[in-house]
Amino acid sequence: MLVNRRYTAKGKNLPSSPKKVRPIADNIRGESYIKAIAVLCSMPNKGAKLLEKVVKSAASNAMYHNKNLSEDMIFVKTVMVDDGRRRKKIWPRARGRADRLVNRNCHIFVEVDEKKDIKG
């Protein structure tokens, strides 16, 4: 019998646009934990560093709740990047006009999975 145990981590209102983080998330979805961290460490993007922190948090949650679990048994099951809170600012322009500047944030949800056989 095969039992799935899933462990999650969330990063809320992280200071990067979801449009910039989603292509990075596509690279690690379905990969092993060790390979995902290696891919994220080699990327120079700000979103990769944010995603790396959330993936490490999910893996540490898994290892905390299951003491006989090691890093090579963990896989990245789900990565979701959603819109977060938007901060709107007024940007002064020429001739007394003003534009709106929108700073976008994102929510990152990571779910890691481990599979093990149970005899019985």
Swiss-Prot record:
Pfam families for the chain: Ribosomal_L22 (PF00237)
GO process terms (BP): translation
CDD domains to which the protein is assigned, alphabetical: Ribosomal_L22
InterPro entries given in the database record: Ribosomal_uL22, Ribosomal_uL22_bac/chlpt-type, Ribosomal_uL22_bac/org-type, Ribosomal_uL22_CS, Ribosomal_uL22_sf
GO cellular component, one term: cytosolic large ribosomal subunit
Alphabetical keyword list: Ribonucleoprotein, Ribosomal protein, RNA-binding, rRNA-binding
UniProt similarity note: Belongs to the universal ribosomal protein uL22 family.
PANTHER family reported in the protein's UniProt record: CHLOROPLAST 50S RIBOSOMAL PROTEIN L22-RELATED (PTHR13501), LARGE RIBOSOMAL SUBUNIT PROTEIN UL22M (PTHR13501:SF8)
Biological role stated in the UniProt entry: This protein binds specifically to 23S rRNA; its binding is stimulated by other ribosomal proteins, e.g. L4, L17, and L20. It is important during the early stages of 50S assembly. It makes multiple contacts with different domains of the 23S rRNA in the assembled 50S subunit and ribosome.
Assembly: Part of the 50S ribosomal subunit.
Protein's UniProt name: Large ribosomal subunit protein uL22
Species per Swiss-Prot/TrEMBL record: Borreliella burgdorferi (strain ATCC 35210 / DSM 4680 / CIP 102532 / B31)
